């Protein structure tokens, strides 16, 4: 299958590498010139569960897409605030048969995608895989993970199941979900706790879990997400979601991982996606007249940190 990874950072590199290993024709597209140059010159290098691998993949700079060949599937991994620009830039690769799978962190991205892609070709999901970048063209890929996905509108269930099958053939453990909005909110609770808290506290997830207030902070933030989700007909099982979030503390699985927001801001001095995670809950709280004080404050803290570090 001809697959384009739109946003080839840490997670895009993981999916690109695994789909390439699975026999698909993969093209990476990214906006970081040094990263694209490194992959063109040396291949995508990865520490893959302790094994050093190099994959020679097609790669293009987002602002200089030369290919006019249409793609079968686009997997969106760009940063949320860059989604609209990415979709503009990859328009030449999209036709009426191109499927678009959004696996971005956060809530409500389909509203942006619909401006460029017909609803019957849009699929949304989330992933529990983790990944890191050690530098341009160099990924660190440890642990196991999974993907859940669903068609945006009814009638495309079989296509969604086929996409899950294609991803699973490359070891990505994908499955069809008939309630993806629940899964997206559940995953957003992971990001809404681990990302902001680890970034502000300058620790990995296991370190956060060792602090005495960690459990109370997780419970409070999950309750804020759940209160907003209820207004969108998503009823989170709060106890189950809290338990799920706190599995991230385990150092024998992914606890030693630094979340993507930490990598963006603390390691790479980049702006974060906080406005699409806790910030989204904060905005929706105002819309639905629901108090979200922890999400409000965490959003302000992260933006303050961005300013202090002069993130770009």
Curated annotation (Swiss-Prot):
GO annotation, biological process: pantothenate biosynthetic process
Location in the cell: Cytoplasm
Binding residues for NADP(+): 7-12, 105, 131, 273
Reaction equation(s) it catalyzes: (R)-pantoate + NADP(+) = 2-dehydropantoate + NADPH + H(+)
Domain of life the protein comes from: Bacteria
GO cellular component: cytoplasm
A Pfam family per the record: ApbA_C
Active-site positions on this chain: 187
Record InterPro entries: 6-PGluconate_DH-like_C_sf, 6PGD_dom2, ApbA, Ketopantoate_reductase, KPA_reductase, KPR_N, NAD(P)-bd_dom_sf
Pathway the protein contributes to: Cofactor biosynthesis; (R)-pantothenate biosynthesis; (R)-pantoate from 3-methyl-2-oxobutanoate: step 2/2
Gene Ontology molecular function terms on file: 2-dehydropantoate 2-reductase activity; NADP binding
Enzymatic class: oxidoreductase
Keywords attached to this entry: Cytoplasm, NADP, Oxidoreductase, Pantothenate biosynthesis
Binding-site residues for substrate, renumbered to this chain: 105, 191, 195, 260
E.C. numbers: 1.1.1.169
PANTHER family in alphabetical order: 2-DEHYDROPANTOATE 2-REDUCTASE, 2-DEHYDROPANTOATE 2-REDUCTASE-RELATED
NCBIfam families, A to Z: apbA_panE, PRK06522.1-2
Family classification: Belongs to the ketopantoate reductase family.
Function text: Catalyzes the NADPH-dependent reduction of ketopantoate into pantoic acid.
Protein name: 2-dehydropantoate 2-reductase
Organism taxonomic ancestry: Bacteria, Bacillati, Bacillota, Bacilli, Lactobacillales
């Amino acid at each position: 299958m001809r697959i384009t990874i739109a946003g080839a950072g840490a997670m895009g590199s993981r999916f690109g590498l695994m789909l390439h290993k699975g026999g698909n024709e993969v093209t990476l597209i990214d906006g970081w010139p040094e990263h694209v140059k490194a992959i063109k010159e040396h291949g995508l290098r990865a520490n893959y569960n302790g094994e050093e691998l190099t994959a020679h993949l097609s790669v293009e700079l987002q602002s200089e897409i030369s290919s006019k060949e249409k793609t079968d599937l686009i997997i969106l991994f760009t940063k949320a605030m860059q989604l609209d620009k990415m979709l503009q830039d990859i328009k030449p690769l999209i036709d009426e048969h191109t499927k678009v799978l959004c696996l971005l962190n956060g809530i409500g991205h389909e509203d942006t995608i619909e401006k460029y892609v017909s609803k019957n070709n849009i699929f949304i999901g989330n992933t529990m895989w983790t990944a890191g970048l050690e530098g341009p063209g160099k990924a660190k890929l440890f642990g196991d993970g999974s993907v859940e996905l669903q068609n945006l509108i009814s009638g495309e269930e079989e296509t969604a199941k086929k996409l899950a099958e294609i991803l699973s053939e490359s070891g990505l453990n994908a499955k069809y979900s008939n309630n993806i909005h629940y899964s997206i909110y559940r995953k957003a609770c992971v990001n809404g706790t681990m990302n902001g808290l680890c970034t502000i506290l300058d620790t990995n997830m296991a370190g956060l879990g060792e602090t005495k207030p960690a459990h109370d902070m997780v419970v409070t933030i999950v309750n804020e997400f759940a209160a907003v989700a209820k207004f969108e007909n998503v009823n989170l099982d709060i106890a189950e979601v809290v338990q799920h979030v706190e599995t991230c503390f385990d150092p024998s699985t992914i606890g030693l991982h630094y979340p993507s927001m930490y990598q963006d801001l603390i390691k790479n001095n980049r702006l974060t996606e906080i406005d699409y995670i806790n910030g989204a809950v904060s905005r929706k709280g105002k819309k639905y007249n629901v108090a979200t004080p922890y999400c409000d404050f965490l959003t302000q803290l992260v933006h303050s940190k961005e300013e202090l570090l002069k993130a770009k």
